[in-house]
């Protein structure tokens, strides 16, 4: 069990992910989300589209914050083959953790 009374604010950040999930998010929204994740020392920064993976990987380079791409977001209605391709592409572009939306 974790004794929260003995944790610093910096250490506590690792208990949380930070995410920007709206499909209408802009590059500025994603970059700002990365800055917030760094400010609070989050475990991961998650986003709704693999499209943002290279930008997030660039923003988080040199940190231990995980690059969290969503696969099949938001409804998981894609076929397994499409999700497999999306997974491979996200990892190739720099994702270090994946959030797979099941159907």
Question: Model regions: which residues?
Answer:
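Alpha/beta enzyme core
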Residues: 2-45, 52-103
